[in-house]
Amino acid sequence: MEEPIIIDNNNIESLSQQQHSTVTNIDSNAGNVLYIDKDMWWKLLYTMFITTGIGYLMAKRNSTSKFRIIKPIPVVILGYIVLLWCSIHHKSGTQQMFNLIIPNNPTTYAMYISVGLFLSAVGDFFLLYKRFFIHGVFFFLVAHISFIFAFTSSEQFFTPTVTALLVGIVCLFVYMYLAKVFPLFSKMGISKSLAIALLFYTSVIVTMCFTASVKSFLKLITIINNNHDIFSNIFSSFSFYASIGAIGAVLFFISDLMILVREINQLANGQVSTIRKLLGHGDLGMIVYWLGQFCIALSVTEF
């Protein structure tokens, strides 16, 4: 004869607590799995960025034209990472797995940065072919403008002081260009139309560097004001991320200048100094360019 089942309220309460503990542990473990997957996904993306960059440099060195097509891929990956960053850090844990694949809910800053990166990638593609050089430069010009929109996206950016400084710096740059660089181009046989186009292009780059620097400076001031310990804040990770966008913009500018140096070196028929050869080295220019784009992409983590 089977023994009767005795229902005890204490046993039910104990069982309920055990089930709740089990569910909690499962949720906790699931959260850990999500975190590990996210971490692995970032590592995979950064590995792809570095690997494709090295692959392009090797293909270029070995004159493998078929594989040089991977040149735009590193910057495309950076644009994708920027959008994913916003997706993951603005959603709850239960949605993170989906957001690891499909970007959504990006900030205004991230949108402008990612658009600039994707436009740069298109420019990289066109620059693979000499007959599309102008097309590539155009896409890079629009990419710079997109970065300017990102750096100035804050409503408090354009104060009278900042606006006056921006106008003054651009005017000074134009004057120096016309007084020093323009005559040099004339001696080298460069047409006036090309020299004027370069003036417009470099003016946009100078504006990008200035707006990125002002944005970083204002962010640093905010960080310092929130904590009176100035020295610890200056060397904190927050200050680093606040400054990284300006560093990236300057590196981007330097990479463009290195392209200009390389073109001038070619016109000089090899009669150039060792420093100019180094500055005009294509591989070094690409590394500086990728570092600049990486820093600009990394600036999205400030938000």
Curated annotation (Swiss-Prot):
Keyword Transmembrane helix carried by entry: yes
InterPro entries found in the cross-reference section: TMEM86B-like (IPR012506)
Major localization listed first in the record, in broad terms: membrane
Regions that span the bilayer: 39-59, 69-89, 109-129, 132-152, 165-185, 194-214, 234-254, 278-298
Pfam families on file: YhhN
One of the record's GO cellular component terms: membrane
Topological category with respect to the lipid bilayer: Multi-pass membrane protein
Gene Ontology molecular function, alphabetical: hydrolase activity
Key words, A-Z: Glycoprotein, Membrane, Transmembrane, Transmembrane helix
Glycosylation sites: 62
Description of what induces expression: Down-regulated by Pseudomonas aeruginosa, PAO1 strain, infection and by phagocytic stimuli but not by Pseudomonas aeruginosa, PA14 strain.
Intracellular or extracellular location(s): Membrane
Family: Belongs to the TMEM86 family.
Name this protein carries in UniProt: Lysoplasmalogenase homolog
Species: Dictyostelium discoideum (Social amoeba)
